[in-house]
Amino acid sequence: MFKKMDKKAAQRIAMEYRAMISKESLFSIGQNSNNIYEWTAVIRGPDGTPYEGGMFNLSIKFPTDYPFKPPKFTFKTPIYHPNINDEGSICMNILKDKWTPALMVEKVLLSILLLLEKPNPDDPLVPEIGQLFKNNRFQFDQRAREFTARHANN
């Protein structure tokens, strides 16, 4: 049973990868040449946000029972954000309890872009940053811009 699940996961991952590289997108992706279960992605910081101009690297690791379990998305580029911690973990419901097999990597990446545009300070992974976002948006934006300039200018 495990091998059958593993094969189905690999087929789905390969299909999603082919679909994503065959069209223009808001992000670029790559695949570990030795492991189909490991991808990289680069997201450009959305215009009009403190992340504008930044290039953010992420790793994507798929479980062997994908798509029944979500892949793990991790920011490798440090980012100042209430829903992303120092280890690069992302607090997003579609990566946890709202995950369904119908979701695909492209949809998650688009959701991450939206999270950069509209952080959710009411469900922060980093409470101090969430509080700053709510109480002093100017200072939050300034810190996020400085962090982006320091870490995300590839």
From Swiss-Prot:
The protein, known as: Probable ubiquitin-conjugating enzyme E2 31
A GO biological process held by the record: protein ubiquitination
Function, as annotated: Accepts the ubiquitin from the E1 complex and catalyzes its covalent attachment to other proteins.
EC annotation from Swiss-Prot or TrEMBL: 2.3.2.23
Family (UniProt): Belongs to the ubiquitin-conjugating enzyme family.
PANTHER family on file: UBIQUITIN-CONJUGATING ENZYME E2
Annotated UBC core domain residues: 8-153
Lineage, uppermost ranks: Eukaryota, Viridiplantae, Streptophyta, Embryophyta, Tracheophyta
Enzyme class: transferase
Annotated metabolic or biological route of this protein: Protein modification; protein ubiquitination
Induction: By biotic stresses.
Gene name linked to the record: UBC31
Pfam families (UniProt xref): UQ_con
InterPro entries reported for this sequence: UBQ-conjugat_E2_core, UBQ-conjugating_enzyme/RWD
A GO cellular component entry from the record: plant-type vacuole
Source species, domain of life: Eukaryota
Cleaved signal peptide residues: none
Catalytic activity: S-ubiquitinyl-[E1 ubiquitin-activating enzyme]-L-cysteine + [E2 ubiquitin-conjugating enzyme]-L-cysteine = [E1 ubiquitin-activating enzyme]-L-cysteine + S-ubiquitinyl-[E2 ubiquitin-conjugating enzyme]-L-cysteine
Entry's Gene Ontology molecular function annotations: ATP binding; ubiquitin conjugating enzyme activity
